[in-house]
Curated annotation (Swiss-Prot):
Natural source organism: Roseiflexus sp. (strain RS-1)
Compartment(s): Cytoplasm
Transmembrane keyword on record: no
Gene that encodes the chain: pth
Protein name per UniProt: Peptidyl-tRNA hydrolase
Entries under PROSITE patterns matching the protein: PEPT_TRNA_HYDROL_2
Length: 217
């Protein structure tokens, strides 16, 4: 099975903040598969069901961000999972540009207090995670104020597409495994094809002479 945990803070006050993008993506995945958060256990709201033929539990910790590890450790014990292969944590990352997704099988917490809590209480950095870029704060901003602030209207308009892609990434992990998902999600976007143009000194194509094309740039 997979335990997929979205990180965030409970309550309407925080619902649309940058720090709650993990909540929103996991909720998007639940809505897509018509799973409802009807269970409460280990300080988390839980939706259980089947995705891509695999048993899954989707979790939204209710401990507030800095204590996320309490919920994750409790759920690990409840479901008897191996975090290295059956836990997937979804969270915001200020070290990635806005909207960029990155899948990793292990790693440090960086500046993220929720991840720091999970790593500390699990006693391991070895568990999969999906990081969602929210960009760095402006130089004069306090980090806490930034992550607890809302996205700009321009960013908010892009979020539905970003959350769809993030939910797609989670489905790929469940269906095909981390190796396939990482190759697909972490691959750089394809470079646009360079437009071909006729060399300025090439003969006109209407003539009987051969023409030549040169790459732009």
């Amino acid at each position: 099975m997979w335990l997929i945990v979205g990180l965030g803070n409970p309550g309407d006050t925080y619902a649309r903040t940058r720090h709650n993008i993990g909540f929103r993506v996991v909720s998007e995945l639940a809505q897509r598969h018509r799973l409802e958060f009807t269970h409460k256990r280990a300080h988390a709201r839980i939706a259980e069901g089947i995705i891509a033929g695999q048993r899954v539990a989707l979790a939204l910790p209710q401990t507030y961000m800095n204590l996320s590890g309490q919920a994750v450790v409790g759920l690990r014990q409840w479901y008897k999972i191996d975090p290295a292969t059956e836990l997937l944590v979804v969270y915001d990352d200020v070290d990635l540009p806005f909207g960029v997704l990155r899948l990793r099988e292990r790693g440090s917490a960086g500046t993220h207090n929720g991840m720091r809590s999970i790593i500390t209480l699990l006693g391991s950095q070895v568990f999969p995670r999906l990081r969602i870029g929210i960009d760095r704060p402006p130089p004069a901003w306090d980090l806490a104020d930034y992550v607890l602030g809302r996205f700009t209207p321009e960013q908010e308009a892009q979020l539905p597409d970003i959350m769809q892609k993030a939910a797609d990434a989670l489905e790929t992990v469940v269906r095909e495994g981390m190796a396939v998902a990482m190759n697909r999600i972490n691959a750089p976007p394809p470079k646009p094809k360079r437009e071909q143009k006729r060399s300025s000194d090439a003969p006109d194509s209407s003539s009987d002479t051969n023409t030549s094309n040169a790459s732009d740039g």
